[in-house]
């Protein structure tokens, strides 16, 4: 497959069952997904950086629609990445950003919305402490 999202969801599933180290060992290499910022998201899960994803979101001076799409996918996958890494506060922050404009992003927008609601419930139940 040449779809970064397939590789990322595989990573997320493996990390939930067998841990992050196992997910890293089994991470699927993708070389030709050209969607912004998916290349950088793939790199993030393969030991890249948050900054690479954030920079890619704005690279090339995208128009408003492209910027909104880039921000949505960047924030969604940054949130899921940080959740897998055990950083619940950063995860919740990025997922909340992705969920804000969920209506414009179809199925994946609904994923962001539902995940945000789930994380809010965890905060309410004091399973995750909100950022101060």
Which stretches of residues belong to each language-model region?
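Alpha-helical junction/boundary sensor with strong preference for TPR arrays
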Residues: 1, 31-34, 45, 60, ...
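Alpha-helical repeat scaffolds
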Residues: 20-34, 52-64, 92-96, 126-132
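Alpha-helical tetratricopeptide repeat
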Residues: 69-80
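Residues that mark the junctions of alpha-helical repeat units in TPR/alpha-solenoid scaffolds
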Residues: 3-5, 64, 71, 109
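TPR repeat positional signature
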Residues: 7-9, 14, 37, 75, ...
């Amino acid at each position: 497959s040449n779809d970064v999202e397939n590789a990322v969801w595989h990573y997320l599933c493996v990390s939930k069952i067998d841990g992050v180290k196992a997910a890293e060992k089994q991470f699927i290499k993708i070389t030709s997904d050209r969607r912004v910022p998916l290349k950088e998201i793939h790199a993030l899960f393969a030991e890249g950086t948050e900054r690479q994803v954030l920079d890619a979101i704005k690279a090339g001076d995208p128009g408003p629609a492209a910027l909104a799409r880039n921000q949505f996918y960047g924030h969604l996958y940054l949130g899921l990445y940080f959740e897998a890494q055990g950083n619940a506060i950063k995860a919740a922050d990025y997922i909340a950003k992705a969920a804000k404009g969920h209506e414009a992003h179809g199925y994946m927008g609904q994923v962001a919305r539902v995940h945000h609601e789930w994380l809010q419930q965890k905060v309410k139940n004091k399973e995750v402490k909100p950022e101060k």
